């Protein structure tokens, strides 16, 4: 079994830049995931974010989760549950407008730490997008511009805790899915594992590493690269012991950004491979995704292509 790709970002600044870029390229094409170390975000900040997030769960979220479990009778389930996940979550929005000040129950130091962490992640996401541009042969800044829309990209964070589960064989922490958006940056618990990705028909553990950031490719990067980079199915396995923390930040296109394969990449393709993916508004894709998240991505792309064809075949407006 190949080793899970771990990228040391410090190596991008010296003689090992070329093999490191090749490793990123291989990860994007064949894994859809890679793990970053020496990414420039201070360990002290990450430790603070982790401590405050776990304290917040214990103080404000744990009892609510236990009440939900009791209400739904989940501790006594005898058959597989396919319509919910064993997770406790809340969401933060950073771009286009932050809502961190509006989230109830967050201590002021937690708000401050999450805001600083999000700012660092935003810069890291944009740095990574330029590395992906370089690897695939697009001009620097292309992916950021493609995500822009009229108000810039959207950027938000899903803060999750996965408590100990009495029946992990019957309930997933998070059911298998691909991510709808652009590039995802995950700060995960380094003690309790659970994240897995699907590669060559097998579920592979994403290894928990202290102070690393796990990166994965969303559906929109697959579209823009015309399939060169792949979003892959992943899931979270609930665990009988330990509470797993997950802070996933999603750097996505703006809601009105128009997604389509980069012409520079399409032009290089053989005729039959010219444009495999449709052209659509990101918000329309998200509406479709909301109901089909836990299904394969290909029917979503086909549905968007059908919508595109319907628009193209429609009457021409005259004024």
From Swiss-Prot:
Sequence ranges assigned to domain Fe2OG dioxygenase in this UniProt record: 153-253
Catalytic activity: 1-aminocyclopropane-1-carboxylate + L-ascorbate + O2 = ethene + L-dehydroascorbate + hydrogen cyanide + CO2 + 2 H2O
EC identifiers of the protein: 1.14.17.4
InterPro entries, A to Z: DIOX_N (IPR026992), IPNS-like_FE2OG_OXY (IPR044861), IPNS-like_sf (IPR027443), Oxoglu/Fe-dep_dioxygenase_dom (IPR005123), Plant_2OG-oxidoreductases (IPR050295)
Pfam families on file: 2OG-FeII_Oxy (PF03171), DIOX_N (PF14226)
GO biological process, one term: ethylene biosynthetic process
First-level EC class: oxidoreductase
GO molecular-function term, one example from the UniProt record: metal ion binding
Cofactor or coenzyme needed: Fe cation
Superkingdom as given in the UniProt entry: Eukaryota
List of residues binding Fe cation: 177, 179, 234
Pathway: Alkene biosynthesis; ethylene biosynthesis via S-adenosyl-L-methionine; ethylene from S-adenosyl-L-methionine: step 2/2
Keywords carried by this UniProt record: Ethylene biosynthesis, Fruit ripening, Iron, Metal-binding, Oxidoreductase, Vitamin C
Family per similarity comment: Belongs to the iron/ascorbate-dependent oxidoreductase family.
Name of the protein this chain belongs to: 1-aminocyclopropane-1-carboxylate oxidase
Organism: Actinidia deliciosa
């Amino acid at each position: 079994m190949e080793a899970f790709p771990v990228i040391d970002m410090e190596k991008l600044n010296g003689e090992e830049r070329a093999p490191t870029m090749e490793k990123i390229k291989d990860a994007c094409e064949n894994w859809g995931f890679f793990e970053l170390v020496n990414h420039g975000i201070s360990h002290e900040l990450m430790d603070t974010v982790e401590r405050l997030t776990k304290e917040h769960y214990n103080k404000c979220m744990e009892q609510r989760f236990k009440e939900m479990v009791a209400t739904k009778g989940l501790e006594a389930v005898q058959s597989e549950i396919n319509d919910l996940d064993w997770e406790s979550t809340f969401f933060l929005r950073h771009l286009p407008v932050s809502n961190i000040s509006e989230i109830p129950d967050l201590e002021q130091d937690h708000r401050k730490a999450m805001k600083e962490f999000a700012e660092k992640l935003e810069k890291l996401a944009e740095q990574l997008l330029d590395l992906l541009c370089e690897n695939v042969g697009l001009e620097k800044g292309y992916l950021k511009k493609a995500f822009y829309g009229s108000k810039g990209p959207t950027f938000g964070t899903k803060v999750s805790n996965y408590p100990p589960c009495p029946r992990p064989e019957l309930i997933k922490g998070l059911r298998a899915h691909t991510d709808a958006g652009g590039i995802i940056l995950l700060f995960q618990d380094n003690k309790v594992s659970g994240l897995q990705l699907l590669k060559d028909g097998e579920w592979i553990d994403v290894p928990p590493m202290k102070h690393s950031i796990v990166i994965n490719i969303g559906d929109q990067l697959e579209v823009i690269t015309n399939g060169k980079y792949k979003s892959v199915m992943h899931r979270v396995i609930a665990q009988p012991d330990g509470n797993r923390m997950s802070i996933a930040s999603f750097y996505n296109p703006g809601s009105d950004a128009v997604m389509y394969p980069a012409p520079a990449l399409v032009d290089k393709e053989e005729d039959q491979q010219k444009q495999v993916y449709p052209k659509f508004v990101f918000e329309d894709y998200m509406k479709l995704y909301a109901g089909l998240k836990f299904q394969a991505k290909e029917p979503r792309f086909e549905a968007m292509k059908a919508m595109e064809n319907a628009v193209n075949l429609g009457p021409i407006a005259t004024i």
